[in-house]
Amino acid sequence: MIAIIDYNAGNLKSVEKALHFLGEDCVITRNFHEIETADKVILPGVGAFGDAMEQLKKYELDKVIHQVTAENKPFLGICL
């Protein structure tokens, strides 16, 4: 399963639609457990890094991102 991180910004639905087109199982989530247990993680972009970081910190998603990248889990950040 691929976790698409939901931080109230980004092109979530476009990424989800593309993954479904490719036959991939995915979930849009900000749930730590779903992100930690996913096989792969995608962080959709907004084109404004400062705004993205503000939202990630608001939901404390920066912590789970550090965790999954430290574990060398496949991680894709888009347009940040």
Predicted regions and their residues:
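N-terminal beta1-alpha1 cap of cysteine-dependent amidohydrolase-like domains
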Residues: 1-76, 80
